Amino acid sequence: MAIEPKVIEAFIEIPTGSQNKYEYDKERGVFKLDRVLFSPMFYPAEYGYIENTLALDGDPLDVLVIVSNPTFPGCVIDAKVLGFLNMIDGGEEDQKLIAVPTEDPRFKDVNSLNDLPKHKLDEIAHFFKTYKDLEGKKTEVGAYEDAEAAAKLIDECFARYKG
């Protein structure tokens, strides 16, 4: 029996369709342009993180929220976590949560990665496999894991943050 997806607040840094990589500077309370992607690619979903978490790469836990329309940097989205994509980036483990907004009726019946079009998951994996190629950096993309594994990962990252 499948578990109910965990609902989180996703703090969005980069809207769907952007080539700009923004990062939130907590000390200054502003969004800073970290870089523009070297490749003619764009973020395939809203990209951000869960506050008060600490992933294995030393940053807050990353989340992609698949939306009908782009939002904006600083938007907070209540989202159902469907699973995550395993990656290696810069030699470090890096997981990308995959989620959908709770407040969009188009995603009402989406409760697992299997409810998404396979092509969307392929787009996300392809993006993260190739988006740093022209920078001369390599990333490795692994398998997707389900909502139950994602819930465990989220709990671990909250606990790691609390130290």
Swiss-Prot record:
Keywords: Cytoplasm, Hydrolase, Magnesium, Metal-binding
Membrane-spanning residues: none
Binding annotation for Mg(2+) 1: D57, D62, D94
Binding-site residues, Mg(2+) 2: D62
E.C. no: 3.6.1.1
Binding site for substrate: K21, R35, Y47, Y131
Molecular function as annotated in GO: inorganic diphosphate phosphatase activity; magnesium ion binding
Catalytic activity, as annotated: diphosphate + H2O = 2 phosphate + H(+)
Gene3D superfamilies: Inorganic pyrophosphatase (3.90.80.10)
Compartmental location: Cytoplasm
Reported function: Catalyzes the hydrolysis of inorganic pyrophosphate (PPi) forming two phosphate ions.
Record's subunit section: Homohexamer.
Family: Belongs to the PPase family.
Name the UniProt record assigns to this protein: Inorganic pyrophosphatase
Organism: Halalkalibacterium halodurans (strain ATCC BAA-125 / DSM 18197 / FERM 7344 / JCM 9153 / C-125)
Gene from which this protein is expressed: ppa
